[in-house]
């Protein structure tokens, strides 16, 4: 019999089982997108501590909300205080990231643009979150003096400090990627 050998294989199997057994809504993602004026997406704002990720995330959520988009700031700390409160210590980082991904998936299924920020999003966490969020798009915005990896948007520390301008840049990118479409588009 098959038995997953790596953490990635185990998570992939869990997601496959979850998706196969998931009780799906009768409302299709396209219908939600039409109603909301946007497609569901997970936006990960990554970077070093003190780089302005939190204020940027809150500004982005607020601006999207003000423009009648369904947005939600899903902070990892809140998930840790709620559904991950039973984990207790920092040795369960993988499980904390998995639970964040599962909560994000619920919001994505409801059609939201989910914004999350953490100092602890490692490459492995991001890959797990992409797997958990599938089929929804995951956008990485990296705030750093020296970017690493291949984020969708890179912002310098100075750019991120001007949260309003940075939020506009992100929204322009989301429009370009056809995530934000406005309330007058047709399917």
Predicted regions: what they are:
Residues 1-187:
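Glycine-rich phosphate-binding loop of ATP-dependent small-molecule kinases
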